[in-house]
Amino acid sequence: MAFVFYCFLQVLVSWVIHAVQPFCLPECTCSEESFGRSLQCMSMSLGKIPDNFPEELKQVRIENSPLFELSQGFFTNMSSLEYLWLNFNNVTVIHLGALEDLPELRELRLEGNKLRSVPWTAFRATPLLRVLDLKHNRIDSVPELALQFLTNLIYLDISSNRLTVVSKGVFLNWPAYQKRQQLGCGAEFLSNMVLSLHNNPWLCDCRLRGLAQFVKSVGPPFILVNSYLVCQGPVSKAGQLLHETELGVCMKPTISTPSVNVTIQVGKNVTLQCFAQASPSPTIAWKYPLSTWREFDVLASPIAEGIILSQLVIPAAQLVDGGNYTCMAFNSIGRSSLVILLYVQPAQAMPGLHFLSTSSEVSAYVDLRVVKQTVHGILLQWLTVTNLAEEQWFTLYITSDEALRKKVVHIGPGINTYAVDDLLPATKYKACLSLRNQPPSQGQCVVFVTGKDSGGLEGREHLLHVTVVLCAVLLALPVGAYVWVSQGPYNFSEWCWRRCPLHRKTLRCPQAVPQCKDNSFKDPSGVYEDGESHRVMEEDEEVEKEGIS
């Protein structure tokens, strides 16, 4: 009987102890410490902080767990929490309101996570925070007023991150430092401020001048854990210690060039040069009128610290390449620009270029192309350059064998495309672009022939054959058409010989020099061919008649 009573007593005591013991999360351990109740979760399988934390916790320590973010509302039942350790997890994001339920928080440790930035204004909800440990993350910047809401912070560790530039104002605006400045003689009763900045890839240029001065003169109340901040860049200062490096004052770029006026003969190569000096080193870009049509190589090379030489290489300059070339340099301080005027002198004969002239000595260079085929038609695109400063109007003429009257479209300044819709199958069309109201005979033309209608819209997607019926029109030969001519049943010379009766003795068309020979013109898209053999008009009489018109 005594033995039975003893067993009953043991079970009763065990039940009472279990009933009194507070709840603890699975995979975690709870304990009573001198500062209060503590929860430790090591190598948990959870992906977020559980929402059923035991109440009245003073410390939470979660480490080596797949924890990815701190979201708003995670700490709803933890208003008394003072110590939060979330080291060696995978935290990448801290939401702005994640800390709003932690008014008593005094210590936040986030070592060894994957943070790229910190929502510094979130610390408005934790005015009692004294320790902030962010080492071994991926933070690459700290705003100048980052610490303004951390009024009681005395320990900040942002070492082993990806910081390259930090203003000394970040630390001079530290509220604890400002408080010392205000108290003056009574400041000796305040705690020192511990700061850790080492093992960052510091870029030692003028932007770190203030921090370098701060490190050189650092002393109480500041204590640097490691004052040896090593420069990783620029190359000339790599490996040097920041406090031993002489850094100049930042300045915006200044630009110079050997010549602001450059004159060359057409067809010659030319290189425009631009020198930019700035601190920190500038970035250089070029702007010129035909940048959307002709793309030139740009070479950049450092001449000295803070001095960059940029070269714009123009191969086989054409008349249309003349104009203003703007060299632009910019850095974090400002930007500057310089204009270089390029003048391309014409040669006696200009094969490959087509000019439109008027009686008032106004001329224009025109490059007319068929750049795209749609289900219902084609898209024409052109490049025009006139010898007058004011913008010019152009007239687009579209005719066909079937149409009784030609279509006339007046094109205003700034427009360089036109869609031709509702094309008939098996029909030859001619599009000409003229200056102002000049007749189409004085413009540049492109001729295209639609293929047979092979069944519905799907067939119409492949009905276009761009072909050039006249040798004279080869001046406006689009890239797609030129590919067809060079790959068709005749070679280029034979085709011209068959189609140009006046030039059959020479076996070539002297004016038929295809544009884009140097591939410098950017062709938005070639014309789609349908795989059928291209047919040249069979009647020589029709060709000759077209040549007369």
Swiss-Prot record:
PROSITE patterns named among the record's database cross-references: IG_LIKE, LRR
Domain LRRCT: 200-252
Signal peptide boundaries: 1-22
Region described as Disordered: spans on this chain: 521-549
Protein localization: Membrane
Domain Fibronectin type-III: 361-447
Residue intervals passing through the bilayer: 463-483
Ranges: LRR repeats: 80-103, 104-125, 128-149, 152-173
Cysteines engaged in disulfide bonds, as pairs: C274-C327
Membrane-topology annotation of the record: Single-pass type I membrane protein
Record InterPro entries: Cys-rich_flank_reg_C, FN3_sf, Ig-like_dom, Ig-like_dom_sf, Ig-like_fold, Ig_sub, Ig_sub2, Leu-rich_rpt
Pfam family, one: Ig_3
Positions annotated with a glycan in the UniProt record: N90, N261, N491
Keywords: Disulfide bond, Glycoprotein, Immunoglobulin domain, Leucine-rich repeat, Membrane, Repeat, Signal, Transmembrane, Transmembrane helix
Domain Ig-like, residue spans: 253-339
Ranges annotated as biased composition (Acidic residues): 538-549
GO cellular component: membrane
Residues in LRRNT domain copies: 23-54
PANTHER family per the UniProt record, alphabetical: LEUCINE-RICH REPEAT, IMMUNOGLOBULIN-LIKE DOMAIN AND TRANSMEMBRANE DOMAIN-CONTAINING PROTEIN 2, SYNAPTIC ADHESION-LIKE MOLECULE SALM
Protein name as annotated: Leucine-rich repeat, immunoglobulin-like domain and transmembrane domain-containing protein 2
